[in-house]
Amino acid sequence: MKPYLELLQHVLEYGAEKSDRTGTGTRSVFGWQMRFDLNAGFPLVTTKKLHLRSIIHELLWFLQGDTNIAYLKDNQVRIWDEWADANGDLGPVYGKQWRRWTGPDGVEIDQMQWLVDEIKRNPDSRRLVISAWNVGELPQMALMPCHSLFQFYVVDGKLSCQLYQRSGDIFLGVPFNIASYALLTHMVAQATGLGVGDFVHTLGDAHLYSNHFEQAREQLTRTPRPLPTLRLNPDVTDLFAFRFEDIAIDGYDPHPAIKAPVAV
């Protein structure tokens, strides 16, 4: 996870001090890219322990088109609790846009199903793009999409993914985002009969909150450990049929977790 640690170090040393929506204050840089070879191990941060259950269940929740936190709460995942209303609803966030994007004519579009079909039909397409940034529905969202657009690319029978993330909470959010989109790439590859290539992570405003500086410095004192490996149930070939038990991470031996407050 050298690219991630380099980002952490760079922002601590050279980031610009900025105010932000939450009132916490940040140190940030604009425009940063990381690349992870998905054949060299699963890109899961080892310099602190991540909550795998949250990463996996959140992605499955997105893929089902769900926007209510009931499923997450039922599976002991609390990462969206602060933004949900009294009924557990978040408005038309990621799952809605991925699976039921509403066009100007009111017709809903299943972007993810289209993506799987198009990769099979035309793997050389330059239009293998999914967007969660539906301008007409942004005001209704509890939180506007941070990881807003991603694109797939096929060459030599391998599927790569590039994510554009407009806003990245480097200490808490970005490690989750790396793992989530790496997992998604593996799942889409299996559903389309492909191997995996790279995950490319492009960040717009990459920031550390001011109350995460000490935690980031502590993390940088730790020596990275070998990356784990991802194991998917080979019998699942429908992207939307994956369940939690179909996904396993082997050999994850991280340093202890480092607690940090969430900026809401």
UniProtKB/Swiss-Prot annotation:
Q: From which domain of life does this come?
A: Bacteria
Q: Where does (6R)-5,10-methylene-5,6,7,8-tetrahydrofolate bind?
A: 51, 169, 263
Q: In which pathway does it act?
A: Pyrimidine metabolism; dTTP biosynthesis
Checking Pfam families in the record gives: Thymidylat_synt (PF00303)
Detail which positions bind dUMP.
21, 126-127, 166-169, 177, 207-209
| Record-annotated active site | 146 (nucleophile)
Report the enzyme's class at the first EC level.
transferase
Where is this gene product found? Cytoplasm
Q: Which reaction does it catalyse?
A: dUMP + (6R)-5,10-methylene-5,6,7,8-tetrahydrofolate = 7,8-dihydrofolate + dTMP
Return one GO MF term.
Answer: thymidylate synthase activity
Record flagged with keyword GTP-binding: no
NCBIfam families reported in the protein's UniProt record: PRK01827.1-3 (NF002497), PRK01827.1-5 (NF002499), thym_sym (TIGR03284)
**Role according to the record:** Catalyzes the reductive methylation of 2'-deoxyuridine-5'-monophosphate (dUMP) to 2'-deoxythymidine-5'-monophosphate (dTMP) while utilizing 5,10-methylenetetrahydrofolate (mTHF) as the methyl donor and reductant in the reaction, yielding dihydrofolate (DHF) as a by-product. This enzymatic reaction provides an intracellular de novo source of dTMP, an essential precursor for DNA biosynthesis.
Q: What is this protein called?
A: Thymidylate synthase
